Amino acid sequence: LGPTNPGAQSVDALASGNVRAFQLYTNTDIEIKSLGFGVGLSKKLPSNFEVSANYNYAQFDFDQSKDPSFEAGFNTPKHRVKASISNDNLFKNFGFNVSARWSDEYMWESSFADGMIDEVTVIDAQISYGIPSLKSILKVGATNLGGTEYRQLLGPGLIGQQYFVSLTINP
């Protein structure tokens, strides 16, 4: 037999698909700067209306050239916003809630895939009906009313619409 050539063995293994992939998670000695904050406001308005909004900011910086093999996996959009308007008693026993969520594009890094997650705006809504005789509330609603499928990470499937009905007894 003679000496083995690890380089040739590696090339042969890659060419034939005879490999097992794995991810080794490590830290890094390079300087990493991160900053984040969130702020939310809510205001009751006349006639039982309420508006609310929140904003989240997340920033993560480091010099990739100082450690090219380091994969941060921060996986968070820099900007996220949510706003809603609601009224739990718009008229006798009826209420509603409509909200909009937005996030900008961001880089997704993981052991199985790296790539950009697109900017997305999603609108959700629900109506509610109070049933005083049963001390209950019936809610009917939907998420992602626009119907455009979107993703929040790489790997799993796309997120579509979801419809729901709930009955809360003795709220």
PLM-predicted stretches and their roles:
Residues 50, 56, 72-171:
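Conserved C-terminal beta-signal and adjacent last beta-strands/turns
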Residues 3-107:
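Gram-negative outer-membrane beta-barrel transporters
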